[in-house]
Amino acid sequence: MSYLFTSESVSEGHPDKVADQISDALLDEFLAYDKSSKVACETLVTTGQVVLAGEVKSSAYVDVQEVARAVIERIGYTKSEYQFEAKSCGVFSAIHEQSGDINRGVERQDPYNQGAGDQGMMFGYATNETENYMPLALDLSHSLLSELAFIRKNEIEKMPYLRPDAKSQVTIEYDDNGTPLRIDTIVISTQHDEFVLPADDSKAAKDAADKAMQDRIAADVKSLLIPRVMAQYPPQVQALFTDKITYHVNPTGKFVIGGPHGDTGLTGRKIIVDTYGGKGAHGGGAFSGKDPSKVDRSAAYAARHIAKNLVAAGVADEVLVQVSYAIGVAKPMNIFINTYGRSNVKLTDGEIAEKVWNLFDMRPKAIEDRLKLRNPIYFETASYGHMGRTPQVVIKEFNSRYNTAPVICEVELFTWEKLDYVDQIKEEFGL
């Protein structure tokens, strides 16, 4: 019997994502000037205010206000009517030094004996449902919003009313074998200008103006946004876009008040959007604002790297990887594998886990080195998903009034998405 599964995403202008991006921009700034920085930075955003808090150990001095304002401006909060604007909002910092008790458990004379920054379990997941080994409902949800943001920033004349805050949700019908059959429902909620004004102060005139705005936005979503997103996918995914899709565009009827003025945003509140959209599993730890000594982040990336390479190598069509740690201990407590009965090798999931244990060094320092995580690569992860992205080499420049010369870094983004272990896995599993 078929079933429906739903995933959601939020835009870079969503208040929780504004907070995530500020936290990761601060992390990048510290790492650009001091790669050994230990950072745990949280951000709160609300009407006209940004609050920064957390723990840092670094030789770098960062102008946190300047970094926060630059992120807010880059996202697009540049108008006073948003009630949250880059130049005028208040930025309060309560960032202080990292606890010595934590630091003594993390740092070691031999860096490869570096202990995990905390206890916990982390998960990685991959499926052959899409070309990037991600769940399709989540991937579509991300694509809808990243394309909407592209239009807002680069082709404003096409949808000139767009504001930064937005959410999406996609429901897909699957058959018993987990194969997508069709897209059932698409939800788009996008913040917008009040671009149709009522003829007078009567309720009827206000309702008519609101309906005119909603009709225009719904028409643009269906005629402009949906075809552009469809074109990004292979034919088998395009075929899922039928004329039977149910669309809900701004279903409340109006979305003018939004962003941090509409809802308070906090770092780390969109962990399912950040990962697998409800597929697989999540250990509960957020990513943004944390340097790679925090296994909440680094081990989750490493687990995704393992899962993706296992599926790409043909070990299974779907894989969940769990790894767990104790604070101050380098080696993980366990590695667990679940192939959901979709394994392509004559091994139990426990036997697959044993091979994975031998193939991948999951000590925190080994993960940092393998995935090049001691670089300023994190701002780009903080919107539209940490997983399923395209690895790429970029040049990043950091300028601070506290440093005489800019720092220019060549860094590799999304290294955990590379398929660089496929050959080793095939050899190990005899594929």
What would you call each of these model-derived segments?
Residues 37-41, 166-172, 245-249, 315-326:
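A short glycine-rich, hydrophobically flanked beta-strand micro-motif that places a catalytic Asp/Glu
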Residues 12-31, 126-150, 290-314:
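Alpha-helical support elements that line or immediately flank enzyme active sites
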Residues 1-40, 45, 422, 428-431:
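N-terminal, positively charged regions that mediate nucleic acid binding
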Residues 8-10, 14-19, 115-130, 256-281, ...:
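Conserved phosphate/anionic-ligand binding catalytic regions in large, soluble enzymes, centered on
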Residues 40-58, 327-331:
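Short, charge-patterned binding micro-sites
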Residues 6, 66, 73-257, 388, ...:
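Glycine-rich, mobile lid/loop segments that gate access to catalytic sites or pores
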Residues 46, 318, 325-431:
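Internal helix-turn-beta structural module
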